[in-house]
Curated annotation (Swiss-Prot):
Cited HAMAP family: Ribosomal_uS13
Region Disordered: start-end pairs: 98-126
A Pfam match: Ribosomal_S13
One BP term from GO: translation
Gene3D superfamilies cross-referenced by the UniProt entry: 1.10.8.50, 30s ribosomal protein s13, domain 2
UniProt GO molecular function: rRNA binding; structural constituent of ribosome; tRNA binding
Keyword check for Zinc: no
Family in the record: Belongs to the universal ribosomal protein uS13 family.
Its biological purpose: Located at the top of the head of the 30S subunit, it contacts several helices of the 16S rRNA. In the 70S ribosome it contacts the 23S rRNA (bridge B1a) and protein L5 of the 50S subunit (bridge B1b), connecting the 2 subunits; these bridges are implicated in subunit movement. Contacts the tRNAs in the A and P-sites.
SUPFAM superfamilies: S13-like H2TH domain
Name of the molecule in the record: Small ribosomal subunit protein uS13
Chloroplast is among the record's keywords: no
Provenance organism: Bacteroides fragilis (strain ATCC 25285 / DSM 2151 / CCUG 4856 / JCM 11019 / LMG 10263 / NCTC 9343 / Onslow / VPI 2553 / EN-2)
Biological classification of the source: Bacteria, Pseudomonadati, Bacteroidota, Bacteroidia, Bacteroidales
GO cellular component: cytosol; small ribosomal subunit
Length: 126
């Protein structure tokens, strides 16, 4: 039986601490805190969780963490706000360049996309 938390099926054969990181917005440290608060051993595999343990974890995540769609929409709204107020970071987002001060002379290919090749000028014939 697959355990579903906030719309994500957790992998059955992984430890609980790792399996919870499949949820967007929960990393290793957050998953360890959640499992401690729920009283579940973090080395216990997901398939060995009881229904009560899964329900307790669901309850903790729902009450204390912003995850999946809510978190994604909040991040998008934050980026949109930066773009609307026209600050430097918003402008960098709008034109698709690195936002955190990285150099763009040579690299930054992830943000800029594939190279746009420029044709050479033809030599003028006399």
């Amino acid at each position: 039986m697959a355990i579903r938390i906030v719309g994500v099926d957790l992998p059955q054969n992984k430890r609980g601490e790792i399996a919870l990181t499949y949820v967007y917005g929960i990393g290793r440290s957050s998953s360890a805190k959640i499992l401690d608060k729920a009283g579940v051993d973090k080395d216990l595999k997901v398939k060995d969780w009881t229904d009560d343990q899964a329900a307790k974890i669901r309850e903790i995540i729902g009450a204390e963490y912003k995850v999946e769609g809510d978190l994604r929409s909040e991040v998008q709204l934050n980026i949109k706000r930066l773009m609307d107020i026209g600050c430097y970071r918003g402008v960098r987002h709008r034109i698709g360049l690195p936002v955190r001060g990285q150099s763009t002379k040579n690299n930054a290919r992830t943000r800029k996309g594939r190279k746009k090749t420029v044709a050479n000028k033809k030599k003028a014939t006399k």
